[in-house]
Swiss-Prot record:
Catalyzes the conversion of inosine 5'-phosphate (IMP) to xanthosine 5'-phosphate (XMP), the first committed and rate-limiting step in the de novo synthesis of guanine nucleotides, and therefore plays an important role in the regulation of cell growth. Could also have a single-stranded nucleic acid-binding activity and could play a role in RNA and/or DNA metabolism. Its main location: cytoplasm. It is found in: Cytoplasm. The gene is IMPDH. Homotetramer. IMP binds at residues 317, 358-360, 381-382, 405-409, 431. Residues 103-163, 167-228 form the CBS domain. It catalyses: IMP + NAD(+) + H2O = XMP + NADH + H(+). Changing residue 319 to S: Has less than 0.06% of the wild-type activity. This is Inosine-5'-monophosphate dehydrogenase.
Length: 503
């Protein structure tokens, strides 16, 4: 006989936080939003900790390399979408890992007998303005000079000018030995007023380039999420079909964490995928799993060895899984149920497995609710799709600037691997839509504004950390009338005057 749940499931919109005591030190500047990304034993620390509890969704229209770089600068992490070829996904991961490494392996290189046209082509392809000239045109050839925009011919139509005739030769370059520390390299850049400092070995082979822009950027971005080599952290999505080929390529490219991307993660296919990764890499490769919406699903993936588990089916703004298949659960109820099972699992095993709330976030305060209910971090699609750094184009519709946003279950994404249970047969219907979202500008400004709200609400609850919020939060269900009462009502808001229609 089928199991029935008597209580209806709820969304974040049906809850509010009740204020707690705010002490004198409860001010937003004192709030610490760091949170674990992967599982750890009681008494130990997670091997990867986010500095902010936000990650971008594994979607074509959200998480490309620009998004990954921008979010890592702010302390979060992106999961590069897997609905593309293995080679292109690995290339995106590689680009993020090498964007700011302190010591950067040059990806813009020419030989001295090449031309200005070649320099322009490389700069356009890589978006880098410093081109290394090596004897063989490789990243680690003998360094002969550099070409920057200051070396360009006055007449830019002289595209046949030889590189050897326009470059700044090695004899005029300031360089440093490969034993030089990053702090020492930055000091040289600062004192010599350089934009780029080539790092060479004893035989004049180019090893790396240290850029001034990376130093300047690090002074502004104090919250950057980087590895031990000062490279940005980046995640990548995988599926349960080609994981035997995709995972090694992503690991080789430098992915810091993987996540199985599926609309329904309560599946033996995910267990098989995790098992294969554990057999080949042990615990060195971190992999999340999901999505699930109840404690039973959590327990299955926890026992399978998942490093974190995602919660949510059908709650995304572009997801139509619920109306197509009748599968899913209200996001708030799902988080509450899964967190209860996670806490029980922790008591039984001493292993803390972070959970991610994926979907259902409409307003910024929903982020705070998800965290208060026990989520360790939040995966967002629509939220990040609005930003300049998302990989979609901007369009103007009825005078408003919009960005395209489509679901991985839409025909446009054609990523059927996410929306089946494995095997060879693929589904023939959509579980996502193709849409637009209002353009919101740069990621940095928007994330800062959203997290300021989260911090302020945490202070209202008397909490300075996410664990404190989860232990102190007082959460109440609200009626539909209370929801109306919570917004502006019985007035005509000035910026909405053109939309006013008397009853």
């Amino acid at each position: 006989m089928a199991k029935y749940y008597n209580e209806p499931c709820h969304t974040f919109n049906e809850y509010l936080l009740i204020p707690g005591l705010s002490t004198v030190d409860c001010i937003p500047s004192n709030v610490n939003l760091s949170t674990p990304l992967v599982k750890f034993q009681k008494g130990q620390q997670s091997e990867i900790n986010l500095k902010i509890p936000l990650v971008s969704a594994i979607m074509q229209s959200v998480s490309g390399e620009k998004m990954a770089i921008a979010l890592a600068r702010e302390g979060g992490i992106s999961f590069i979408f897997g609905s593309q070829s293995i080679e292109s996904q690995a290339a995106m991961v590689h680009a993020v890992k090498n964007f700011k490494a302190g010591f950067v392996v040059s990806d813009s290189n020419v030989k001295p007998d090449q031309t200005f046209a070649d320099v322009l082509a490389i700069s356009q392809r890589t978006t880098h303005n410093t081109v290394a000239v090596t004897d063989d045109g490789t990243p680690h050839g003998v360094l002969l000079g550099l070409v920057t925009q200051r070396d360009y011919p006055i007449d830019l139509t002289q595209t046949e000018t030889k590189v050897s005739d326009m470059m700044t030769p090695f004899s005029k370059l300031v360089t440093a030995h490969q034993d030089t520390k990053l702090s020492e390299a930055n000091k040289i850049i600062w004192e010599k007023k350089l934009n780029a400092l080539p790092i060479i070995d004893d035989d004049q082979h180019l090893r790396y380039i240290v850029f001034r822009k990376d130093y300047d950027r690090s002074q502004v971005c104090h919250n950057e999420l980087v590895d031990s080599q000062k490279r940005y952290l980046v995640g990548a999505g995988i599926n349960t079909r080609d994981f035997r080929e995709r995972v090694p390529a992503l690991v080789e490219a430098g992915a810091d964490v993987l996540c199985i991307d599926s609309s329904d993660g309560f599946s033996e296919w995910q267990k098989i995928t995790i098992g294969w990764i554990r057999e080949k890499y042990g615990d060195k490769v971190k992999v999340g799993a999901g999505n699930i919406v109840d404690g039973e699903g959590f327990r299955y993936l926890a026992d399978a060895g998942a490093d974190f588990i995602k919660i949510g089916i059908g709650g995304g703004s572009i997801c139509i899984t619920r109306e197509q298949k009748g599968i899913g659960r209200g996001q708030a109820t799902a988080v509450i149920d899964v967190v209860a099972e996670r806490n029980k699992y922790f008591e039984e095993t001493g292993i803390y497995i972070p959970v991610c709330s994926d979907g259902g976030i409409v307003y910024d305060y929903h982020m705070t609710l998800a965290l208060a209910m026990g989520a360790d971090f939040i995966m967002l699609g629509r939220y990040f799709a609005r930003f300049e750094e998302s990989p979609t184009r901007k369009v103007t519709i009825n005078g408003s600037v919009m960005k395209e946003y489509w679901g991985e279950g839409s025909s446009r994404a054609r990523n059927w691997q996410r929306y089946d249970l494995g095997g060879k047969q693929k589904l023939s219907f959509e579980e996502g839509v193709d849409s637009y979202v209002p353009y919101a500008g740069k990621l940095k400004d928007n994330v800062e504004a959203s997290l300021n709200k989260v911090k302020s609400t945490m202070c209202n609850c008397g909490a300075l950390t996410i664990p404190q919020l989860q232990s102190k939060a007082k959460i109440t269900l609200v009626s539909s009338v209370s929801i109306v009462e919570g917004g502006a009502h019985d007035v005509i808001v000035k910026d909405r005057i053109n939309d006013y229609h008397p009853k």
